Amino acid sequence: VDPALFDMDLMEQKAPHGSSIREFLEDSSTILALNGGFFEIDHSKRLSPSGVLVINGKIRNASLHDRLSGALVRNSEGITIIGAKDLGPLTNYDFALQTGPILVEDRGKLGIRRNDYDRVNRAAVCLRDHLIIFVTLHGSDGNGLSLYEFAELLAAREIDGGLGCNLAINLDGGPSTQVGMKVGGTREEVDGLWKIHNAIVVRRK
C-alpha cells in the first residue's frame, strides 16, 4: 500500500481471550487486517502482548522481550523498522510493535544467517521504496518456509522472483497466521487456527 493513500495502524483484541481476523475486519473503515505480534496466554486463556506495544500513542506494554529483536514503528517521520534496543522513549511513537526477527536489514541485506529448516506459515511487513507490502505465506498442509527461506524471498530482487524489500520484519506466524481484506464489495479471509492479541489494519485516508 501507498502511505499517501492509506493509513496503517495497530488494533488490539476486542475480548480478553483474543480476536479472529474476521473480527478485526468488522470495522467498516478497515480494508485489510493481518495478524500482528506475538502474545502470551495465561492459565485462564487470556492473551497479553509479548514485548513492547504502543497503540494510538498509548503504551499497552512497556516491557522489552529479550527474544524479539525488532520493532515496527510509526513516529513523526513515518513508518519504519528498527532494532528493539533502539526504541528509546515509547512516547515518541504513534504505534510500536516489538516483534522479529528482522528478516531484511538496511539496504536489502539478509537478516537471517542460517537455515534451521523449521518450515511453518509466515507473515511479515516489507518496506520497499515508498510502499508498505504485507506478506503472508500459507502452506496447504501448514508447512511454509523457514525464516531463512522467507528472508531470501523478501530480499531477492523482483527480477529474480523476490519482493525486493529494503527492510522487512517477521510477525507472529504458524497457527496465528491470518489475513483478511475487502475487495470490490466482497470479503476474502484466510483464517488462522486460533485467535490473536493484535493485528495490523489498513484504512483508506
Name these PLM-found stretches.
Residues V1, N35, V73-R74, E105, ...:
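Hydrophobic side chains in beta-strands
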Residues L34-G36, G83, E105, T136, ...:
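Pocket-edge structural micro-motifs
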Residues H43-D66, R113-A123, L127, L131-K205:
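Conserved, well-ordered active-site substructure
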Residues F39-Y117:
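Active-site-adjacent helix-turn-beta-strand microarchitecture at beta-sheet edges
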Residues L32-G36, R74, L167-L171:
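General beta-strand structural signal in soluble alpha/beta enzymes
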Residues V1-L64:
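Zymogen propeptides
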Residues Q13-H17, A84-L90, L137-G142:
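Short, solvent-exposed aromatic-acidic interface loops
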Residues P3-L5, S76-T80, C126-I133:
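Beta-strand-turn-beta hairpins that frame and shape the catalytic cleft
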